[in-house]
């Protein structure tokens, strides 16, 4: 399982997880051109297989056509709930690192193409988003 952290995350947050987890985690800037479209990124990840996207883009969860495309390409997405990106960088990184084992377990068991929301509260369970 490989994880791509999208541009909503500071590259330093991805680097912190890489330092702890290893090369199974990549920031979007390290894999794709800055002007790469979401569609091109999803298609490339689908061709390679085995990718899960971690996104702070709330539109992914809200726009039905994007959810359909991700499901069609069998890309699982973990989307941050509203409020995550309002946190200071250190707190955002700490919460993400704290939940990382849970994210990996959920990614291992999620049906390909599923969208899952990660709440800000560490006590709250992950929530599968509507298809």
Feature names for model-found ranges:
Residues 1-36, 59-60:
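Active-site-proximal, substrate-binding regions of enzyme catalytic domains
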Residues 2, 19, 95, 121, ...:
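Ribonuclease/tRNase effector modules and their secretory precursors
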Residues 24-25, 48, 78:
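Catalytic phosphate/metal-binding cores of nucleic-acid and nucleotide-processing enzymes, i.e., regions
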Residues 36-48:
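Acidic, metal-associated active-site segment
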Residues 45-66:
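Acidic, metal-binding active-site segment of PIN/NYN-like and related structure-specific nucleases
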Residues 46-53, 96-108:
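A polyampholytic, Gly/Pro-enriched intrinsically disordered region
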Residues 60-96:
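Mid-chain, well-packed structural core segment of small domains
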Residues 102-131:
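Charged phosphate-binding loop/patch that engages nucleotide di/tri-phosphates or the phosphate backbone
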């Amino acid at each position: 399982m490989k994880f791509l952290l999208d541009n909503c995350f500071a590259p330093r947050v991805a680097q912190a997880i890489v330092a702890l987890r290893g090369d199974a985690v990549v920031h979007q800037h390290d894999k794709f051109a800055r002007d790469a479209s979401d569609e091109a990124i999803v298609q490339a990840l689908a061709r390679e297989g085995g990718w899960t996207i971690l996104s702070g883009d709330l539109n992914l969860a809200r726009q039905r056509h994007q959810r359909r495309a991700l499901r069609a390409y069998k890309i699982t997405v973990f989307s941050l709930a509203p409020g995550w990106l309002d946190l200071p960088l250190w707190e955002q990184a700490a919460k993400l690192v704290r939940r990382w084992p849970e994210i990996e377990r959920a990614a291992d068991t999620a049906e390909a193409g599923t969208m899952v929301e990660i709440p800000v509260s560490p006590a709250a369970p992950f929530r599968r988003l509507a298809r």
